[in-house]
Amino acid sequence: MPASLLELKKRIASVKQTSKITEAMHMVSAAKLNQTEKRDKGYQEYNRLLHQTVSRLMSASVINHLNKANYRLTQDNIDSIDYDDVFGMGIISDMIKPREEVHSVGYLVVTGDRGLVGSYNSSVIKQMMSLVADDKLQGRESKILSVGSVGSQFFKKNNLNVVYEKDGVSDVPTFKETLPIVSTAIKMYLNGVYDELYVCYTHHVNSLSSAFRAEKMLPIVDLDIGTMEAKESKKIEFEVAPDIDSVLATLLPQFARAEIYGAILDAKTAEHASSMTAMKSATDNAKDLVSSLSLQMNRARQAQITTELTEIVSGANALE
């Protein structure tokens, strides 16, 4: 067999072997995606109910405190509430009261531990660098808590301030597994390491689509504090022992931990979807390449056969 045909045959065999590997990786990613989607769906329902509970308890507590002070709460003066005056100095005020000045911002950035996931890692890093640049323009310090070795290596290589890093989060993370991560992030905020905490990650929309998110986790700002009338209607739905503030002091840190874990789980779901899409694309490209190489090999064979037949006919004519 001529060298060109032999080379084409080897390339076809190599590409076929590669396509088998990428197809297997596609199936593995699809299985992991199915697991994380199921867990994420169930967890989102839990998180929704927890958010609803904390929001209503907070509304009831604020009203109780303000009623004692004969303070009329309206939609116009909600933002002027001083939570230190309402709750006193403590965990509740620490979790929900914005700092007077924001000198540093913490970013818990979720990336993967490996490649072969399409643009999953690069898009998060690109958006993160944009946030860091904005902080620099505003005179704020950016402090990064990195989850995932791809992000950790990039941020340290580019001399960013990485105050915490964690690699090797499992493909289907549990709340218990991520508890050290989220607890450290919250503790750093309460200790004044940074004045705000954001979680930056890729949100899973569906198998073919995802979107970058930078969600503010601390101070907690998305509790439903509406008009006084709305809160009064919510207040009667709970009978709390020993008292609302004691329950809130326990629930608010748990609420923050739940929000951060939900973001990490969402990011892992997006990672598996991106990996599945990338491996399917690689498999399809490999199959197309095999078809193209096979066509080249067939043409080369035809040319070889034509040449050999021509030589045979020419030799026979020469003998006559």
From Swiss-Prot:
GO terms for cellular component: plasma membrane; proton-transporting ATP synthase complex. GO terms for biological process: proton motive force-driven plasma membrane ATP synthesis. It is found in: Cell membrane. The keyword Ion transport applies. One of its GO terms (molecular function) is proton-transporting ATP synthase activity, rotational mechanism. Its main location: membrane. Keywords: ATP synthesis, Cell membrane, CF(1), Hydrogen ion transport, Ion transport, Membrane, Transport. It comes from the Bacteria. Belongs to the ATPase gamma chain family. This is ATP synthase gamma chain. The lineage of its organism: Bacteria, Bacillati, Bacillota, Bacilli, Lactobacillales. The gene is atpG.
